[in-house]
Amino acid sequence: MQPKVNIMHLPVYQPGKPIEDVKRELGLDEVIKLASNENPIGYSPKARAAMLDEIDHLHIYPDGASVDLTAVLASKLGVESNQIIFGTGSSDIILMICRAYLTAADETIMADETFSQYKHNCEVENTNIIEVPLKDGKHDLNAMLAAVTERTKVLWICNPNNPTGTIIGREELEAFLAKLPKHVLVVLDEAYGEYVTDPNFPNGITLIDRYPNIVVLRTFSKVYGLAANRIGYGVGEASVIRTINQVREPFNTGRLAQVAAKASLQDDEFLARSQASNTAGLNYLHAQFDRLGLQYFKGHGNFIMVDVRTPSMQIFDLLLRKGIIVRAGWKHYPNAIRVSVGTAEQNEKFIQALEEVLIELAVLQ
């Protein structure tokens, strides 16, 4: 049996190392996972109650169109229901966009260090991929614009960018969109957007009326803490969403995911608590990296990329032995690790372990 030639080289996605694997392999009783940008304070109690209420109905297929959830979200966002599509996480929407729009004759543009699933799904469609280097950890919109040709079909912007955590401001984004040819679909991935406190951060959904070639992606995995439920959504002009819907698999969001997401949208107290906890954690980690003399990209999501001045996989392994899981191995940032914001206690334990490791390696005196 012969698979498609263009997928034979593709790596299998590697998530953050599971806690139980680390405990078993290293004989540790406590492990702190700061690798997958999860919500350290959990998820909404209203979502828990909603799932428990639904637990006896798992033998029945979910609403294939997510009608109730769509209505609640549309009201909250100020858009029409036909402008929304749900997926098994926002990564499912990425897959659908590639399936709906890209062929081997097309080109697609993205940053050279960004969320890996853009490139992965474009490669599955055998599309020609143009990777534009980041500039100071940010998307270089001028260079991306210069790379556009008549063959360019989709352009990807992760805002805040994963893994660097940097953002593109409102004026910069709008100036870019005004110059971009209208045949290019812009995927504006705002998976971490709810965490951003910078007043210049653009809400992509408010731009759709003026720029109907935008699709905005968001997720319930991050600030809402529903990572295990796998549910995210896209928002765009109705005809664009209809096109993406044409390639959506049936029943692609589960019953528990739908009711949990709906309840989460109605729990403003939990959302505010998640945001406040994250902001405090970012401020603490920024201050500690300053104290240690480490360079970093200011985090605007729920993670920070920090330069540890030594090969990052070595730091990863040493931190792992101390029961701290982070992410490392970035092609263009070989000396950087990405650490998720944890609870206050977890953040303190991470800094203590990192300082010990850097002193051990003589990176710090």
Task: Label each residue range with its predicted role.
Residues 65, 213-290, 294-297:
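PLP-dependent aminotransferase class I/II
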Residues 30, 80-84, 104-107, 151, ...:
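Short acidic capping loops at alpha-helix termini that bridge into adjacent secondary structure
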Residues 100-157:
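PLP-dependent aminotransferase-like
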Residues 279, 288-322:
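Conserved PLP-binding catalytic core of the aspartate aminotransferase-like
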Residues 1-60, 139:
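N-terminal "arm"/small-domain region of PLP-dependent enzymes with the aminotransferase-like
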Residues 141-150, 163-186, 190-221:
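Active-site pre-lysine segment of PLP-dependent enzymes
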Residues 59-107, 125:
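Phosphate-binding glycine-rich loop
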Residues 318-322, 330-365:
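PLP-dependent enzyme catalytic core of the Aspartate aminotransferase-like
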